[in-house]
Every structure is written in C-alpha cells, then in structure tokens.
Amino acid sequence: MDAPGFTASLVAGGVAGVSVDLILFPLDTIKTRLQSPQGFNKAGGFRGIYAGVPSAAVGSFPNAAAFFLTYEYVKSLLHTDSTSHFKPVKHMLAASTGEVVACLIRVPSEVVKQRAQVSASSKTLQIFLTILSEEGIQGLYRGYKSTVLREIPFSLVQFPLWESLKALWAWRRGHVVDSWQSAVCGAFAGGFAAAVTTPLDVAKTRIMLAKAGSSTAVGNVLSAMHGVWRSQGLAGLFAGVLPRMAAISMGGFIFLGAYDQARSLLLEVGRKSP
C-alpha cells in the first residue's frame, strides 16, 4: 500500500469511527443495559444514556483507523483477480486481521465505557483509575478474547457481504457504487451480522461487567453463554438484539459510507497535489 493509500485509510477510518460512535452512543448504552446481569432498570434504564461517552470518544479514532489501515494493507498483500472466487476469502482474512489489531485499542475503552454505562453515577476517569488500581492493566484488557471472538465472526459476515453487495450493485448499474450506495450495502451487511453474533456480544458484555474474581470474569465465552442460557434461555442470549441491529445497521450506513467517501476524497486530493 502506497503512502497516499496509507494516509487515506488512516484518516478516513478514524473519521468514520468517531462519527458513528458519537451519533449512535445512546443505542449502544440501551443495548448494554439490556444485556447487564443486573437488568435494564437497575443498570440505569433510560437515564444518563451518554454515560461513558468520553471513553468512546477517546478510543474510536485510533480503533477505527487501526482496523481500516490493517484491512486495506492485508487486502493489498493478497492480490486476487477481480473475478476470483477467492475474493471473499481475502476480505475475510483482511477483516479478521484488522479486528485482532483494532481490539488492542478498542477493549480498554470498551471496558471503561460499558462500566460507565451501567453505573451512570460514576465518572469515566474515576472508573478508569479504579480499574487500574484494583485490577491493573489486565483489568483494562478483560474481555479481549471474548471481544475478538465476537468481532471476527461479525467481520467474517459483514465485510465479505458488504464487498459482495457493492460488487453486485456496481454490476447491475454498470458503474462503481457511489458513497451512499456503499452506505446502504453497509447497513444491510451490518444489521445481518449484528443479529447472528448477538449471543457472542451478550457473553462479552457479561465478562466485562463481571465482578473481579468471579467465575465469569475469567473470560470463558462458552461458560458465559451457558450461564446466560441456564438463567434466561434463548431470550437472554439475544438480549438487546433489536437496539444492536438498529445501531449497527445505522452504524454500517454511516461508518462504511463515511469511510468510502472520506477515502475517495483524500485520494483525489492526493492525486491533485503537486
């Protein structure tokens, strides 16, 4: 990947990430409280739905930038013909690698954000310092494995589907898709991926919110899912599925549309610069 492509992916990914995280934060808070083991009302209900937003704001730019930079770089390494049947595999590998890298940034901000979302009376900085003093750096990375195990299946569905829908639309229209068309494809791909990976998201939320030293805090995803299944059944595994689908569908529209638009503009500016 050349220098203009590097810069375009870095900046466009960051801009897209900040945009979607801040716009859709209330839906994310509602989803987190629905999945909380203490229940929606005790976790705060509809009160203080912007609790934890500083953590999201700080982490969103570097997180999204790291993902898209890795995604585009891995795609550039895995050359395939435009008609190759291996294109979906390339997109899967690129997205999976991107998630592993991005989660190194995402997980600490996610841990702080989710704890703030279910205890709106506590300040984000206070929660961050409490985690550091009581659990150390390890506490900030609690749920790293469960987050990666959620994000990789999500990306294995979302990104190949997004790329395939764009290619199909471009073929039907006879030209490369516009940014808004890319956004529509992103919304559909994101909503579908969100629905099928909700049980993994529930497990990740329970692990991040669990009390230090508890069996759930160990981070075993299957054990967390089994615990939810035993206590709440299928409804528990799909708790928050509707706000999650709504947030990620709208997020896919904003995120992938903004990314395509910003990257195209940055590359165009780069070509015009002397």
Curated annotation (Swiss-Prot):
GO terms for cellular component: mitochondrial inner membrane; mitochondrion. It is found in: Mitochondrion inner membrane. GO terms for molecular function: S-adenosyl-L-methionine transmembrane transporter activity; S-adenosyl-L-methionine:S-adenosyl-L-homocysteine antiporter activity. It is a multi-pass membrane protein. It catalyses: S-adenosyl-L-homocysteine(out) + S-adenosyl-L-methionine(in) = S-adenosyl-L-homocysteine(in) + S-adenosyl-L-methionine(out). Keywords: Antiport, Membrane, Mitochondrion, Mitochondrion inner membrane, Repeat, S-adenosyl-L-methionine, Transmembrane, Transmembrane helix, Transport. Solcar repeats lie at residues 4-77, 86-168, 177-265. Its main location: mitochondrion. The chain crosses the membrane at residues 5-25, 49-69, 85-105, 142-162, 182-202, 238-258. The keyword Transport applies. It comes from the Eukaryota. GO terms for biological process: mitochondrial S-adenosyl-L-methionine transmembrane transport; S-adenosyl-L-methionine transport. The keyword Membrane applies. PROSITE patterns: SOLCAR. Belongs to the mitochondrial carrier (TC 2.A.29) family. Mitochondrial S-adenosyl-L-methionine/S-adenosyl-L-homocysteine antiporter. Mediates the exchange of cytosolic S-adenosyl-L-methionine, the predominant methyl-group donor for macromolecule methylation processes, for mitochondrial S-adenosylhomocysteine(SAH), a by-product of methylation reactions. This is Mitochondrial S-adenosylmethionine carrier protein. The gene is Slc25a26.
